[in-house]
């Protein structure tokens, strides 16, 4: 028989930087999860994704055990890294803060497509390009 699920927690945590302080500690503590066990497992699983915030979905069971799924970093983080910028434009219609090539967009799509709501590479590229434009990043050929 399957374990009874008592909760699901969604967080964004910096890769390899999970620790018992807020927001991780309080969110897991309310469900009775062993916080240090989660932190060690998360940090181990994300050691090759350093520098990104990683979305994680933690499923908590009635016996206080847990499983978690890490997803790819948010598209905005991938765009900022590829464009070499620290933040998006304050007025993206007037100010352009960086440039991305179509090849860089497709590279981001290949990393991100598993977490997107489309499996079509061209549609996923349009979504990423729209996110880039809304950040003030110009798409060039």
Curated annotation (Swiss-Prot):
GO cellular component: cytosolic large ribosomal subunit
CDD domains: Ribosomal_L11
PTM info: One or more lysine residues are methylated.
Gene3D superfamilies: Ribosomal protein L11, C-terminal domain, Ribosomal protein L11/L12, N-terminal domain
SMART domains assigned: RL11
UniProt subunit comment: Part of the ribosomal stalk of the 50S ribosomal subunit. Interacts with L10 and the large rRNA to form the base of the stalk. L10 forms an elongated spine to which L12 dimers bind in a sequential fashion forming a multimeric L10(L12)X complex.
Family of this protein: Belongs to the universal ribosomal protein uL11 family.
Protein name: Large ribosomal subunit protein uL11
């Amino acid at each position: 028989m399957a374990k009874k699920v008592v909760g699901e927690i969604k967080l964004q945590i910096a890769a390899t930087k999970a620790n018992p302080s807020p927001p991780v500690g309080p969110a897991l503590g309310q469900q009775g999860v062993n916080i240090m066990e989660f932190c060690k497992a998360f940090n181990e699983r994300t050691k090759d994704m350093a520098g990104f915030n990683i979305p994680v979905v933690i499923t908590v069971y009635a016996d206080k055990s847990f499983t978690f799924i890490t997803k790819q970093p948010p598209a905005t983080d991938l765009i900022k890294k590829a464009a070499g910028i620290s933040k998006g434009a304050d007025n993206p219609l007037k100010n352009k803060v960086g440039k991305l090539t179509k090849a860089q967009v497709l590279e981001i799509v290949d990393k991100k497509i598993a977490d997107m709501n489309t499996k079509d590479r061209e549609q996923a590229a349009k979504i990423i390009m729209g996110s880039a434009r809304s950040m003030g990043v110009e798409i060039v050929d």
